[in-house]
Amino acid sequence: MTTPNIELLTAATPNGQKISIFLEELGIPYKTTAIDLSKDEQKYASFLKVNPNGRIPAIVDHSRDSYPVFESGAIFLYLAEHYDKDFKFSFQDSDERMDMIQWLFFQNAGVGPMQGQANHFVRYAPEKIDYGTKRYKNETKRLYSVLEARLQDRDYLAGKGRGKYSIADITTFTWVRWAPWAGIEMTKFPKLKKWCEEIEERDAVRRGLLVPSGEDQIEKLRRNPDVQDPFKAWVRKGQKEIADTHGN
């Protein structure tokens, strides 16, 4: 196998952290390009060549003709296909692989978008809208209840028996860990909480959580519930730009 040379373009968000964690778990060489969201670097022409949607994370595989990949789910599958040849974090069996992909999509299409909207209405909406806040917090909790049920007699989300730690867990872990950011209490989800805490103890996970800044916003929140929100200004700025460009 060609020596990997992965460039990760990222920021310290749940979607960014999930890919840095997987790269750390794989133990392959990679370099990080920090994308400053407050400066709209994700909208720079150089970044849009990698991801035309202007969102992090993205990777460029310089060991394979500088092949670009965007969307975290696609990045997971790409890295697993090319750099998890021993199936440590994925599955060789076709049924187990499909099991993993289903939970990967469950996070990407459900947990992430719904919890992201909960984040928005809890933290970033310029006016408080009870309907939006309750709708997305409740939907996030419903999705958490699906995960809670899945973990009743299992250690991990995908695989036969009690399951195996895989990219299905990594992709979901970072969002569940950010539950407090959306005002979600974990007391009703004891299995999910335990699963999250155990994954956080992994050495590779701890390293990945500090990419790219060396700081971890959730750890800051645990120490100080009133910690300054580093995302509010650019979220509101981005919403205004979208409204100005695409609004009626």
Predicted regions and their residues:
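Short, flexible loop/turn segments with low-complexity composition
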Residues: 92, 207-216
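Positions that flank functional sites
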Residues: 37-38, 194, 214-215
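GST-like domain detector, emphasizing the conserved glutathione-binding G-site
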Residues: 1-134, 238-248
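GST-like fold's C-terminal all-alpha helical module
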Residues: 103-201
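Phosphate-coordinating loops and pocket residues in cytosolic domains that bind phosphorylated ligands
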Residues: 49, 201, 210-211
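Short, thiol/selenol-centered motifs that function as redox-active sites or metal-ligating centers
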Residues: 13-20, 167-170, 202
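Acidic/histidine-enriched, glycine/proline-rich intrinsically disordered or flexible terminal extensions
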Residues: 212-248
